[in-house]
A protein has these predicted regions:
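Ligand-binding loop in jelly-roll beta-barrel domains
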Residues: 62, 82-108
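Well-ordered beta-strand scaffold positions
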Residues: 34, 60, 68-70
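Short histidine-centered beta-strand/loop micro-motifs
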Residues: 22, 42-48, 89-91
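Glycine- and acidic-residue-biased ligand/ion/polar-headgroup-sensing regions
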Residues: 49-51, 56-61
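Short strand-coil-strand connectors
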Residues: 27, 64-68
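Conserved short histidine dyad/triad with adjacent acidic residue
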Residues: 17, 32-47
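Short acidic-glycine-tyrosine-enriched beta hairpin
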Residues: 67-83
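A short, N-terminal "cap"/entry segment at the start of jelly-roll beta-barrel domains
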Residues: 1-29, 43, 109-128
Length: 128
């Protein structure tokens, strides 16, 4: 089949990752959705070779990118180059839903690294 259709609701409930790429059979680039619970501080991380484009679908995200903090409302887009440190925080009382698209020259494998595993691993596991 040349296309697939789904919704975030079909990919899971509650907070955490929605494996969009796997569910829809996407192979050309990485793509996931993340549902952040209220007042959640995500992991500070970077990638070896994969740039990421973030789309704020619902809510308000605070992006900290190389120490620069930006508040991004629903409908906003943020592009972060691979090795640039980034962290997403939901400082609101409502859920935050973000779509993340990543890739580099067709590379779609997982290549993320936590900046401070002692601090960031529990944050990452909080979105399991």
């Amino acid at each position: 089949m040349g296309y697939t259709v789904s919704s975030l609701a079909e990919l899971g409930e509650g907070h955490g990752f929605r494996k969009v790429r796997a569910a829809l059979g996407v192979t050309a680039f990485g793509v996931n959705a993340i549902v952040f619970p209220p007042r959640y501080e995500g992991p500070n991380h970077f990638h070896d070779s994969q740039d990421e484009l973030y789309f704020v679908h619902r809510g308000t995200a605070t992006f900290t990118v190389d120490g620069d903090e930006r508040v991004v409302e629903a409908g906003g887009l943020v592009h972060v180059e691979s090795t640039t440190h980034r962290q997403i925080t939901n400082r609101t009382a409502d859920a935050l839903v973000i779509l993340v698209v990543g890739g580099k020259d067709g590379y779609v494998e997982r290549d993320g690294h936590l900046v401070d595993p002692e601090v960031d691993l529990p944050r990452r596991q909080g979105l399991a």
